[in-house]
Regions:
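Core segments of cupin and vicinal oxygen chelate
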Residues: 48-99, 144, 160-164, 211-264, ...
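Short, charged/polar, Gly/Pro-enriched secondary-structure boundary elements
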Residues: 111-112, 178, 275-276, 341
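Bacterial N-terminal signal peptides
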Residues: 8-18
Length: 348
């Protein structure tokens, strides 16, 4: 009898142990690291520019952004954050609605221009998507200001594509060649705030889109490590998509991700054609092609340790005191995602 009771007790202990391990496994992120990064917000989106005054004029006069701050920074923390020795940087934050961009000019040392033959399926492609209340009027404003087209012209995505039907979109380039999208949602799509009457033409930034080589690899980074959630997916193709991207035969897998606050991040994986070029291994923050997305983390020190142990490629020398003055972001570091897009992780 005693032997039988001991046997039953042993089985109970074993069962409880198995249940405990299983429960822990179910609550862990897929790679065991999401809690270390835990992104709670997205933005601003940064772009390196060659001539700050020219860029400020373009974004304020043409796209109605408002200047929020204008600072010049230099010193060891600047060098260590951007990974550029001898850096002296002017940073201008500009706001449109609830969202912001940061224009970054390297006064020293200057970098390389965006390749003149850049295409939308090259992996260095990244744009901000500005929501407009009237596509025809917005396009007319851009034409009056002689912007460089990236799309053939505004496109209305077809009704057969349920997830994108009725969306109007157009790609163009700013004065440095950075791609920008204007986008108008139909009534049944987009956040409620994009449909509130405001009397404004350019409303705010819905998302930043990045070209990726493999959606699953990017999801492991942004969803599983950073903790962002998938908010939507679609597969886009046809003449409208080809002329929007200005890439013949374009067929895209599109995945939208969100954090608790700020604009989304959208993956653009070209299923065809597959001839997009990778981000150059020697791309640096002072090159005009450089863009980076700022992500706000609950625990930036844990995030830095996690990325370091996972051998993620760092742009920064490590976690540094953030020289860019933002409310609450005292420390930060910059890393690269699986395709080489720069991501700044900053403290909440």
């Amino acid at each position: 009898m005693r032997r039988r009771l001991l046997g039953i007790f042993s089985l109970l202990v074993l069962a409880l142990s198995v249940w405990n391990v299983s429960a822990r496994a179910q609550t862990q992120p897929k790679n065991g690291s999401a809690s270390a990064a835990q992104i709670v917000g997205v933005g601003p989106i940064q772009m390196t520019v060659a001539d700050m005054d020219r860029s400020v004029d373009f974004y304020s006069r043409v796209l109605t952004f408002e200047k929020a701050s204008d600072t010049e920074i230099a010193g060891e923390n600047v060098e260590h954050l951007f990974g550029v020795f001898g850096a002296r940087v002017r940073v201008v934050r500009m706001r449109l609605g609830d969202e912001s961009i940061e224009l970054v000019q390297f006064i020293a040392p200057s970098g390389r221009a965006i390749p003149a033959d850049s295409r939308s399926n090259d992996l260095w492609f990244q744009h901000i998507a500005i929501i407009v209340s009237d596509m025809d009027r917005a396009y007319q404003v851009l034409r009056e200001n002689r912007v460089e087209h990236a799309s053939t012209g505004p496109q209305r995505l077809p009704d057969w594509n349920k997830n994108a039907a009725g969306i109007k979109a157009f790609y163009f380039k700013d004065r440095d060649g950075h791609p920008v999208e204007i986008l108008q949602f139909p009534e049944d799509k987009g956040a409620a705030k994009w449909h509130k009457p405001s009397g404004r033409l350019f409303l705010g930034i819905d998302h930043t889109a990045i070209a990726v080589s493999n959606t699953e690899s990017s999801l492991k980074f942004y969803r599983d490590v950073l903790g962002m959630r998938v908010a939507g997916e679609s597969e886009n193709f046809g003449t409208e998509q080809e002329h929007l991207n200005n890439v013949f035969g374009a067929r895209l897998r599109i995945t939208a991700l969100r954090a608790a606050a700020g604009p989304g991040i959208e993956f653009l994986e070209y299923l065809t054609p597959r001839d997009g070029r990778p981000i150059p291994a020697d791309e640096r923050a002072n090159d005009i092609v450089h863009r980076q997305t700022v992500l706000i983390a609950l625990d930036v020190e844990a995030a830095a340790q996690n990325f370091s142990s996972n051998k993620t490629r760092f742009v920064s020398s490590g976690l540094v005191v953030n020289p860019i003055q933002r409310s609450g972001t005292r420390k930060a570091f910059i890393v690269r995602d699986p395709d080489g897009h720069a991501i700044e992780i900053a403290a909440e």
